[in-house]
């Protein structure tokens, strides 16, 4: 599972969505995952829950923040390699590799 902690007013989130997420090789990696986009800055109670979860579990409140979970709901990786397509692609590939490694146990 790929979790995207994002915000309505997050300029860097929009940059990633336009410049990186739209690349064919990134979309191919996303096709192998369940994607969840969690908005943390809306004025509703659900966003507050997402923001609290991000801070308590990952000790950060920054956006964008990306996490890949394994089948046991444990974080496999959260270091995205920055906003560079090659680094982000490596992050996704590593998460998929770790997922299948955990799944085969």
Set out the residue ranges of the language-model regions.
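Thiol-based oxidoreductase modules, predominantly thioredoxin-like and allied folds used
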Residues: 6-8, 15-49
